[in-house]
Design a protein with these regions (language model features):
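A short acidic, Gly/Pro-enriched loop at the edge of an enzyme's catalytic core
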Residues: 70-78
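Conserved SAM-binding motif I beta-strand of class I
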Residues: 43-48
């Protein structure tokens, strides 16, 4: 399996198995993880700072985590991102805290922010930087 697609597959399967209402931040031009989560019926939406060519059946919004539209994230039990720029981590943590949901990040290589958060091995290493305090919507 192509390593690039392996990462998205692992992340998508993990998010779909562990959560009910997910938002992907920074979808870019790679909707593979969002596709897996969406096919499981668990993707609320995907976002990026610019308009992106995502499949029509994946709900997409232009949004910037540095000044997010909180309404896009309110129902989420997880916000996740694949290979975000490291400077995006603090505002994503703040966003997850505001809406009280988990924040799960798959970094590029061995990057991490701060203490690296809670590490999760789902075939690739994920970092849970914030765990929502009201897990009523969480599968696990």
């Amino acid at each position: 399996m192509d390593e690039y697609k392996h990462i998205e597959t692992c992340v998508g399967r993990y998010i779909a198995a562990q959560y009910l209402h997910a938002v992907e931040v920074g979808i870019g031009r790679n909707p593979d993880a969002a596709r897996i989560v969406s096919d499981a019926g668990k993707l609320l939406c995907s976002t990026d700072v610019r308009q992106m060519p995502v499949p029509e059946d994946i709900t997409f919004f232009v949004d910037d985590v540095f000044s997010p539209d909180i309404s896009r994230y309110r129902k989420a039990d997880v916000i996740y991102a694949i290979r975000p720029a490291i400077e995006m981590i603090p505002p994503m943590i703040e966003l997850a805290q505001k809406v009280d949901c988990d924040l799960v990040v798959c970094h590029l290589g061995f990057e991490s922010w701060g203490d690296g958060g809670e590490k999760i091995d789902c075939g690739v290493i994920l970092h849970r930087y914030y765990r929502g305090q009201n897990p009523s919507n969480r599968v696990d």
